Curated annotation (Swiss-Prot):
Residues 4-54 form the Kazal-like domain. This is Ovomucoid. It is found in: Secreted. The record marks L16, E17 as: Reactive bond 3. One of its GO terms (molecular function) is serine-type endopeptidase inhibitor activity. Glycans are attached at N43.
Amino acid sequence: TATVDCSGYPQPACSLEYVPFCGSDNKTYSNKCDFCNAVADSNGTLTLSHFGKC
């Protein structure tokens, strides 16, 4: 299983860098910051499905 270290999130602002992550909700997040903020908002229910677009 792919994992991401989201310690230090959520962050108030994310860069526009595009390094896609596919979440367990089948949504593509544009980068680690966007993904980790969503993980923080989900109280840990969101996980990484795989690296890259969904």
